[in-house]
Amino acid sequence: MARRPRFRAPSVEYADGDGGVLVLRGALSAGTRAAYGRIVNGQDLAPGASREDGWQRAFEFLFERLVVSWTIAGAEPLRSERELLGRLRFASADERAWLRERLREHCTQYFPDVHAP
């Protein structure tokens, strides 16, 4: 029996002025939304974690779940979760600010119930 093709969520591209392109998924599962809600409410954080720790974890969580690829200054796009997360952790303050703005913009448009940090 032939397999049905898997549903692929639509993706949206966001370009910066330096040849960079961030591609974000257009869908979030109910389980992902619930897990994000627990992080935002502090339920899935380590004991003693600060508000800033929670904010950073929420940002990283959305980044992990939504980013399909990230092209930086026209270089080969990063696609694996490991590469993407590693690059995020070495991102400059300006790059992080740009990423946060894109995640907020994307969530506002596609997931109004998900409030990005």
Whereabouts are the PLM-identified features?
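Short Lys/Arg-rich cationic patches that frequently serve as NLS/NoLS or arginine-rich RNA/DNA-binding motifs
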Residues: 1-9
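Short acidic-hydrophobic surface loop/beta-edge motif
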Residues: 9-19
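Short, surface-exposed, charged amphipathic helix/loop patches that serve as local interaction elements
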Residues: 20, 25-117
